[in-house]
Amino acid sequence: STSVQDRAVVEIRRGCGRMCRFCQPGHVTLPLRERPAEDIIKITKELVKNTGYDEYSLLSLSSNDYKNINEVIKELAVDFNEKKISLSLPSQRIDGFNLELANLVQSVRKSTMTLAPEAGSQRLRNVIKKNITEDMILNAVLTLYENGWSRIKFYFICGLPTETLEDMDEMANLLNKIKYRARLLKREKSINHGLDITCTLSIFVPKPFTPFQWCGQMDLKEVSEHIRYLKEKTKHIKGLKINYHEDVISQIEAVLTRGNKSLCKYIEALYKKGCYLDAWGEYFKENIWHETAKELGIDLAELAKHQYSTDEELA
């Protein structure tokens, strides 16, 4: 896994007014603040000049919500495009999608466009307050496809509160519908490229200071069953790849993120055993995390799944 990416990064906006119910940064970084456009342009040019990076990222929780985003990218493109310096934006919000921005973002090369529906069914998107519809998703993908993009990446979260196999059915139907509509569009518009879709599934981790902080994490066996079910339902779809994050790491994250002082001895013991670079996959020692928890009488699975009552004291 990669914890740091090889590009110049400039923060353009802090906070987010969308308030998705699973998102911790959106709730703890308020109020919303935007950096002036002229400052962003100046900082980005200096950073690229001084570092030699050939890619830069304009970072925020929702970059296409930044009010001057098109103007900033147009100004930077004047200097950067001819030097083949490309722009990376975090996944674009589908309800804020516009083709002009998409073209500006990938004016150097049309590679992969990343979109984040987060949930595959309309019911579940409503639960998490991700206010986008299936029609919005279809419109964004097909517009990109028609205008030269051949690779789309989706971010989804599995194991969200109230998720069932019916929601997995809806996700499979959505992916199938996208591929079907793309085939129709290819024939209608004589498009000479295909459409490859990569779905990256992360496992829901309840975060403090969010409306879902009281919810327990779904049992990992059940989450794995949901993922297997989705893969089975979509195995016939050509050009679709489904990736998913390690479930054990998600469980540990769920334990630590809502943990209290009772975990101090656990963290100290792990540190003494050499577990301090475990954000990198090659250094993650799963057996040590589990053995240490057992030695201290800590049940990771139960802590991760714990459902807090509204009158229970939070750590």
Where are these regions (language model features)?
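Long, polar/charge-rich, low-hydrophobicity segments
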Residues: N176, Y180-S190, Q213-S224, Y229-E232, ...
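Conserved SAM/AdoMet-binding glycine-rich loop
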Residues: E46-T198
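N-terminal [4Fe-4S]-dependent radical SAM core
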Residues: S1-V9
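Radical SAM enzyme core and accessory elements
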Residues: I227, H236-A315
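Iron-sulfur (Fe-S) cluster-binding segments and ferredoxin-like electron-carrier domains
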Residues: C23-D39
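Terminal amphipathic helices with adjacent charged low-complexity linkers/tails
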Residues: L32-P36, I43-K45, Y53, S60-S63, ...
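Acidic, Ser/Thr-rich peripheral helices and adjacent loops at domain boundaries
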Residues: A77, V105, T112-M113, Q217-Y229, ...
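Local cysteine-cluster metal-coordination motifs and their immediate loop/turn environment
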Residues: E11-H27
